[in-house]
């Protein structure tokens, strides 16, 4: 998982529909993830190439992964991960009991995407922009079985513009159940998304756990729809 600074702000044109590269129906014939360079070194090389896009020197730790998993809704079965990075959160999700076939992992960095694709051959691994999540999840077929229970994010929201934050959050909640959760971590002392912006787009936030032993330490925040928005989403879903 890209640590909190894993910026997913697309520079240049918005990706065309044909730009999204998906693992299905073509998949690697074998798992060659472990035969490549060490994961931490792969991550560090990507940081050297683009420190603004990957604003952390190392992947997230296991303690942070546990804190993120702890915020999943009870009996969550289908999850979307934004910024899969080296797969720290992906492994934790599968270890928690989320079936790989019920997991959509989105990664913008090409090298990290290739690592994820080789490592998690049964998951829906896609190279694309988080702002296009609804189109990506629809094209991949992930939403054919219904909306997700939660989105786990390793994106560097704190480094993004207010507009980009809004676009990502709106895209994420368009793929979630009415009571779905958007789970985010950050190295900052407060929510990476301002309460003013959350009020504008109808979301609420609460602070979750704190990973003291992560490098650097990180806080977890959980975003949900406001009650009125959730009721509207339920009615809209029932009509569909």
Residue ranges and their predicted role:
Residues 179-186:
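Conserved beta-strand signature within the Rossmann-like core of class I S-adenosyl-L-methionine
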């Amino acid at each position: 998982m890209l640590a909190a600074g894993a910026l997913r702000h697309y520079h240049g044109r918005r990706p065309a529909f044909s730009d999204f590269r998906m693992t299905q129906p073509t998949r690697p014939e074998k798992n060659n993830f472990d035969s490549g360079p060490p994961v931490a070194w792969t991550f560090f090389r990507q940081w050297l190439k683009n420190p603004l896009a990957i604003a952390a020197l190392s992947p997230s730790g296991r303690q942070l992964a546990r804190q993120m998993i702890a915020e999943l809704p009870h009996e969550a079965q289908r999850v979307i991960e934004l910024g899969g990075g080296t797969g720290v959160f992906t492994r934790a999700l599968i270890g928690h009991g989320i079936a790989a076939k019920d997991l959509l992992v989105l990664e913008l960095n090409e090298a990290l995407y290739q690592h994820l694709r080789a490592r998690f051959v049964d998951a829906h691994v896609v190279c694309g922009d988080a702002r296009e999540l609804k189109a990506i999840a629809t094209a991949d077929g992930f939403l054919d079985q219904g909306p997700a229970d939660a989105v786990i994010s390793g994106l560097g929201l704190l480094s993004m513009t207010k507009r980009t934050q809004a676009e990502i959050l709106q895209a994420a909640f368009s793929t979630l159940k009415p009571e779905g959760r958007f789970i985010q971590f950050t190295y900052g002392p407060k929510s990476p998304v301002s309460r003013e912006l959350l009020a504008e787009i109808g979301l609420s936030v609460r602070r979750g756990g704190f990973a003291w032993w992560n490098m650097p330490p990180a806080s977890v925040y959980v975003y949900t729809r406001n009650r009125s928005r959730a009721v509207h989403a339920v009615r809209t879903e029932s009509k569909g």
